[in-house]
Amino acid sequence: MKKQPGSFLFDGKAKTIFTTDKPYELLVHFKNDATAFNALKHAELEGKGKLNCQISASLFQLLEKEGVPTHFLGVQDETWMLVQKVDVIPLEIVVRNIACGSLCKETPLERGEKLSSPLLDFYYKDDQLGDPLLTDARLNLLGLTTSGQRLEIQSIAFKVNNILKNFFQKIDLLLVDFKLEMGLNNAGELLVADEISPDSCRLWDQRSDDPEQRILDKDRFRQDLGGVVEAYGEILKRIQGNP
């Protein structure tokens, strides 16, 4: 039975969250908003919310099938997702396979350079601070996780990377990097939360050699390349098995 949204809880950059009739379940509405540079750049793109909801649902189900616990419970309709309520750890967990984005600004690595092994970075989730990169010492100082939780986060993040990288490879998409969020449910279990979509993953089309055309993620919006919704639609089409 389709649940009706209860009280409004939170309005984020791309999603709005509501209570349900159960205390440990929430409804997430995926919006058409596109943002970049900590929301300094903003636009509404018709159809984006529907695509991100469907892509995220498919990828959450893939992870669940492979034994990775997520907050996903089901899809209510094209833009609404039912999820477990979690206490989100205020960390952006970024896994990188290919040098791109901030990594190229902070190191001598060239854009597109394959990393010798996946790199895991933690960023403090705070727009006012600019989501700063955290060292192990700073993570310990802030006390955002226990050492045991951090090891579990690392294990889950690398497992997710292997699953997604292999899956995307089969549909001619290169997983450059991606961002995860995780949180604890009422039973204290660590779950992958938020969303997994072209808003949070860099995906390059291996069917194209053109450095701009191959971009099928939010970098199209960041770099004013256009065709954002069309690129997201191409990803969903391939995920659903339509070459």
Swiss-Prot record:
Pathway: Purine metabolism; IMP biosynthesis via de novo pathway; 5-amino-1-(5-phospho-D-ribosyl)imidazole-4-carboxamide from 5-amino-1-(5-phospho-D-ribosyl)imidazole-4-carboxylate: step 1/2. InterPro entries: SAICAR_synt/ADE2_N, SAICAR_synt_PurC, SAICAR_synth, SAICAR_synthetase. GO terms for biological process: 'de novo' IMP biosynthetic process; cobalamin biosynthetic process. Pfam families: SAICAR_synt. Its EC number is 6.3.2.6. CDD domains: SAICAR_synt_PurC. Disulfide bonds: none annotated. GO terms for molecular function: ATP binding; phosphoribosylaminoimidazolesuccinocarboxamide synthase activity. Coiled coil: none annotated. Keywords: ATP-binding, Ligase, Nucleotide-binding, Purine biosynthesis. It catalyses: 5-amino-1-(5-phospho-D-ribosyl)imidazole-4-carboxylate + L-aspartate + ATP = (2S)-2-[5-amino-1-(5-phospho-beta-D-ribosyl)imidazole-4-carboxamido]succinate + ADP + phosphate + 2 H(+). It is an enzyme of class 6 (ligase). Belongs to the SAICAR synthetase family. PANTHER family: MULTIFUNCTIONAL PROTEIN ADE2, SI:DKEY-6E2.2. This is Phosphoribosylaminoimidazole-succinocarboxamide synthase. The gene is purC.
